[in-house]
């Protein structure tokens, strides 16, 4: 069974799809205790770490890394402030990508990132993900 690591996992909606597709989610992460409760009610075998991603120092090996870092800074429904610290959590996803070196990764966010205010952040994400480790993701 292929392994997956999930970051910014929330209540596990996306991870439920991974499990249904045959993945073993070996680690999930978020900072919200209630999200962990819901997640583990549905996927009790997953190691769910409640911790700020910036403080996670080790990631398990996996064939797939998935994540949906917060979008409030980019979303039409949010404050849309380019300098909010949550707008830079993609760097933590890139750090995990470099550490794990999975065969593939999936990352999702809102279309507001293409807005001219945030375009430089989207371009930085693409650059960081493409250069993560020795694999050369495209």
Indicate where each model-derived feature is located.
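Extreme N-terminal starter segment of soluble prokaryotic enzymes
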Residues: 1-4
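Conserved SAM-binding loop
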Residues: 39
């Amino acid at each position: 069974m292929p392994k997956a690591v999930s970051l910014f996992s929330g209540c596990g909606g996306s991870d439920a799809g991974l499990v249904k597709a045959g993945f073993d989610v070996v680690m999930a992460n978020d900072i919200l205790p209630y999200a962990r409760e819901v997640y583990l009610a549905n996927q009790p075998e997953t190691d769910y770490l409640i911790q700020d991603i910036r403080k996670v120092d080790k990631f398990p090996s996996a064939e797939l890394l998935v994540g949906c870092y917060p979008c409030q800074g980019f979303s039409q429904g949010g404050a849309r402030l380019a300098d909010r610290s949550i707008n830079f959590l993609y760097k933590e996803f890139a750090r995990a990508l470099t550490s794990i070196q999975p065969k593939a990764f999936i990352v999702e966010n809102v279309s507001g990132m293409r807005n001219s205010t945030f375009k430089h952040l989207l371009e930085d994400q693409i650059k960081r993900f493409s250069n993560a480790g020795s694999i050369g993701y495209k």
